[in-house]
């Protein structure tokens, strides 16, 4: 077998700054300038709020084919680790969770909407019909799942993945039955895919307004902004820990699981605290007597494009290259000695040059952060009025520029 790429050994950057066609400092300066100019342009030209909130979540029952496919996916996530003897580099299990469900289906959602909801493997049993109200359970489980992905030493081990999904199945099903929760309230993967489907491309004109409205009408379930911020924080940690800068800063401590756990939570706390401070600052300078928690929840959707940009750029290489191993991994899906397709070896086709891949990542990064600035500006006008909108957004702008530079740093250095 020829496997030129294995999960979690792939570098997200392109190798070194010297590989870039233009100086790295120029990339950072121009990117920051683009975000700031977007902010200035909006202040001059966008004087009224035009985006509305209207989303209503309806818990849908899975179709028969969806249940069959979802059951198959669940079996491939759980059984191989307990009945087979496949390693992570040949098992289908890590490919399904970390490529298929983690990045592949969300990208398809840009065109087809929330596909995951039609086969959700964690929602095979009937769920509550109550209206969703909060996503605290989903947020907690998402934090645990990403800790397993980023801190646990063997996130690709089929047995470990199977154990995690047994726990997820028990917790989500138990919460839906005993606490009368809906799937989107307790299933981190369901909520993740629902959020990314909000960026679905539209053929209706004006295209940009339809996409912005689709994001802006995100339901304000309690805890929603924290889930989105965790999406940003976890990828931020993963990006930084893979750089030589991180190792030079902390040395051999980076190999310790205790330190990694501390750093993982610390970065998420920093992201959340910065966001909360930005909301507090907006209220303070506006003079409005509004509840901080309410404003924090209202601005949650403005961070979604950044979360999506982080996610796509970070895992794009896995989607493009690791997905090519699917037939080999499916050749013996349960690790019991089958030979379904007769595939004995596979070679990865790196059809994009490193600089070409980097260019796509930079474009997606800038586009996501620019969308965030637009959404925040529109909401600021709605809440505080046009004359106050720019002042209330200074900290949000600073955070956006900081996240942009951090993302480009991770993508561009070894």
Q: Which stretches of residues belong to each language-model region?
A:
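Interfacial loop-to-transmembrane junctions
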Residues: 292, 369, 373-400
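Hydrophobic alpha-helical transmembrane segments
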Residues: 26-32, 125, 219, 259-271, ...
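Long, well-ordered mid-to-C-terminal structural blocks that present hydrophobic/aromatic surfaces
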Residues: 241-327
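Transmembrane-helix bundle segments that line or gate the permeation/cavity pathway
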Residues: 2-210, 217-224, 237-238, 370
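Final/C-terminal transmembrane alpha-helix of multipass membrane proteins
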Residues: 311, 390-414
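Hydrophobic alpha-helical membrane-insertion segments
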Residues: 101, 105-107, 225-236, 302-325, ...
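Juxtamembrane inter-helical linkers in multi-pass membrane proteins
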Residues: 121-129, 185-212, 284-298, 328-346, ...
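Hydrophobic alpha-helical transmembrane segments and adjacent short intramembrane/lumenal linkers
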Residues: 303-311, 318-377
């Amino acid at each position: 077998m020829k496997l030129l790429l294995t999960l979690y050994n792939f570098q997200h950057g392109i190798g070194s700054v010297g590989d870039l066609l233009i100086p790295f400092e120029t990339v950072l300066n121009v990117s920051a300038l683009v975000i700031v100019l977007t902010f200035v342009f909006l202040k001059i030209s966008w004087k009224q709020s035009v985006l509305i909130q209207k989303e209503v979540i309806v818990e849908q029952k899975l179709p028969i084919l969806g249940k069959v496919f979802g059951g198959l996916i669940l079996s491939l996530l759980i059984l191989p680790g307990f009945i087979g003897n496949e390693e992570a580099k040949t098992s289908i299990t890590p490919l399904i969770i970390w490529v298929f469900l983690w990045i592949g289906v969300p990208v398809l959602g840009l065109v087809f909407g929330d596909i995951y909801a039609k086969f959700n493997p964690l929602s095979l049993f009937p769920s509550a019909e109550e209206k969703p109200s909060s996503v605290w359970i989903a947020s907690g489980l998402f934090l645990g799942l990403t800790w397993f992905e980023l801190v646990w030493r063997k996130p690709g081990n089929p047995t470990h993945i199977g154990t995690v999904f047994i726990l997820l199945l028990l917790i989500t099903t138990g919460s839906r039955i005993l606490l009368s929760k809906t799937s989107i309230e307790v299933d981190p993967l369901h909520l993740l895919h629902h959020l990314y489907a909000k960026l679905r491309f539209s053929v209706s004109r004006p295209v940009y307004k339809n996409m912005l409205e689709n994001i802006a009408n995100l339901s304000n379930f309690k805890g929603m902004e924290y889930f989105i911020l965790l999406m940003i924080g976890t990828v931020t940690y993963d990006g930084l820990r893979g750089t030589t800068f991180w190792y030079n800063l902390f040395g051999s401590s980076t190999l310790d699981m205790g330190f990694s756990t501390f750093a993982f939570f610390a970065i998420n706390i920093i992201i959340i605290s910065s966001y909360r401070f930005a909301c507090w600052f907006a209220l303070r300078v506006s003079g409005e007597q509004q509840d901080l928690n309410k404003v924090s929840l209202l601005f949650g959707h403005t961070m979604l494009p950044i979360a999506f940009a982080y996610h796509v750029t970070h895992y794009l290489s896995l989607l493009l290259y690791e997905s090519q191993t699917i037939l080999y991994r499916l050749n013996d899906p349960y690790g019991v000695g089958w030979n379904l397709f007769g595939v004995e070896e596979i070679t990865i086709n790196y059809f994009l040059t490193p600089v070409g891949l980097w260019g796509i990542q930079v474009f997606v990064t800038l586009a996501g952060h620019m969308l965030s600035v637009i959404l925040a500006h529109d909401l600021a006008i709605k809440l505080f009025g046009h004359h106050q909108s720019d002042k209330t957004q200074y900290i949000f702008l600073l955070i956006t520029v900081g996240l942009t530079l951090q993302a480009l740093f991770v993508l561009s250095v070894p």
